[in-house]
């Protein structure tokens, strides 16, 4: 009996480990902060990125003798912007009298309509 429960526990633990390993890893997007211009300190940079930039973390990077503060964001939280929908097709405007004549099946002066049964002759 104890052997069955140990086997069941090991199997359950194995399934749990496999389920966790299948989850997608978090991808981070990095961006240089424009507001932090002091000598780069890891703790200050991280604090600035978390409070002012709403980032997950921050770190310092030296590029061509210039110290940069880089903020790291969780890419999965920010969906890419969707393009704007195309503009609607242009509206066709008709003269009120022409449209009314078509609706009422009445001929306008100079208009020839062979299907008009109620038209004056």
Swiss-Prot record:
Epidermal anther cells. The keyword Secreted applies. It comes from the Eukaryota. It is found in: Secreted, Cell wall. GO terms for biological process: cell wall organization. Residues 1-21 form the signal peptide. The keyword Cell membrane does not apply. GO terms for cellular component: extracellular region. Keywords: Cell wall, Cell wall biogenesis/degradation, Glycoprotein, Secreted, Signal. InterPro entries: Scorpion_toxin-like_sf. Glycans are attached at residue 115. Anther-specific cell wall protein which could contribute to the cell wall architecture of epidermal anther cells via intermolecular disulfide bridges. This is Anther-specific protein SF2.
